[in-house]
């Protein structure tokens, strides 16, 4: 029974390996460069920051622990 499980496991790994593309990274790079070439998502240039209520944050001030 253990041998059958082992053989089944090896065959399933082989099948997954056959259907998994080894050049997936290249396809991803093509997708990303195409995305960057097109200029990204439409509407990004129309971005307006949302209003944040509360205390103003000054990045030059040290935080409560005294670290900068």
From Swiss-Prot:
Kindly indicate whether the keyword Signal belongs to this entry.
yes
Q: Which cysteines are joined by disulfide bonds?
A: none
Instruction: Give the location in the cell.
Output: Secreted
Provide the Gene Ontology terms for cellular component: extracellular region
What top-level branch of life does the organism fall under? Eukaryota
* Main localization, broad class: secreted
Query: Which residue spans traverse the membrane?
Result: none
Pro-peptide positions?
27-38
Q: What keywords appear on the UniProt entry?
A: Cleavage on pair of basic residues, Secreted, Signal
Q: Where does the record locate the signal sequence feature?
A: 1-26
Please list the tissues where expression of this protein has been recorded.
Expressed in salivary glands.
Q: What does this protein do?
A: Horsefly salivary gland immunosuppressant protein that likely inhibits the host inflammatory response by regulation of anti- and pro-inflammatory cytokines. When tested on mouse splenocytes in the presence of LPS, it increases the secretion of the proinflammatory cytokine interleukin-10 (IL10) and decreases the secretion of the proinflammatory cytokine interferon-gamma (IFNG) in a dose-dependent manner.
Q: What name appears for this protein in its UniProt entry?
A: Tabimmunregulin 1
Organism, scientific name? Tabanus yao (Horsefly)
């Amino acid at each position: 029974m253990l041998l059958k499980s082992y053989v089944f496991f090896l065959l399933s790994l082989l099948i997954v390996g056959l259907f998994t593309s080894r050049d997936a990274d290249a396809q991803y790079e093509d997708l990303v460069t195409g995305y960057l070439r097109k200029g990204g998502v439409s509407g990004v240039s129309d971005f307006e920051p949302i209003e944040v209520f509360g205390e103003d944050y000054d990045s030059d001030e040290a935080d409560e622990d005294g670290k900068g």
